[in-house]
Swiss-Prot record:
GO cellular component, one term: cytosol
Name of the featured protein: Nucleotide-binding protein CJE0423
NCBIfam families attached to this UniProt entry: PRK05412.1
Function: Nucleotide-binding protein.
InterPro entries on file: DUF520, UPF0234-like_C, UPF0234_N, YajQ-like_sf
Family of the protein in this entry: Belongs to the YajQ family.
Keywords: Nucleotide-binding
Length: 163
């Protein structure tokens, strides 16, 4: 039995789930009656995890956003992890949505502070885009997992490498 147990907190997105949500959103776009006759498009830039939505109507642009968000929720991706990058208008209305796939330093500090303030017997350290949590008892690690899930973060939190 190991004397210390640990796990990593990260915000990594499953790229395949992102792609699946994109495919499902495109399929729904093709079959929606209220979008017939209106030029609407959904594209995904997989490298940057950016959804590019465009429509000839501003109201339908919000419908496209709702479709994408609902498909992401069904695929298990936290909707708070999606940020609106830019909204452009002209002949076509465009909207770019970015999926957050890393813990930035501000959120890492917030998570680390919450863990330290909990008075649990754990050690946490920020390692780039991940936070390593170490404890002698697995119960303490599970309490930290529960604590982090309850924090109001705009990230898709995942726990990895529980040892």
């Amino acid at each position: 039995m190991a004397s210390e147990h640990s796990f990593d907190i990260s915000a990594a997105l499953d790229k395949q789930e992102l792609k699946n949500a994109f495919e499902q959103a495109k399929k729904e776009l093709d079959s929606r009656y209220d979008l017939k006759g209106i030029k609407c498009e959904i594209d995904l830039s997989e490298k940057e995890s950016i959804f590019k939505l465009s429509s000839s109507s501003e109201g339908k642009l919000d419908v496209l956003k709702d479709i994408v968000i609902s498909k992401l929720i069904k695929r298990g991706i936290n909707p708070n992890a999606i940020k609106e990058l830019s909204r452009e208008s002209g002949a076509m209305f465009r909207l770019n949505l970015k999926a957050n796939d890393a813990i930035d330093s501000e959120n890492a500090k917030k998570i680390n502070k919450a863990i330290k303030d909990s008075k649990l017997k754990v050690n946490s350290s920020i390692r780039g885009e991940e936070i390593r949590v170490v404890a002698k008892q697995i119960d303490d690690l599970q309490a930290v997992m529960k604590l982090v899930k309850e924090l109001d973060l705009e990230l898709n939190i995942s726990f990895k490498n529980l040892k």
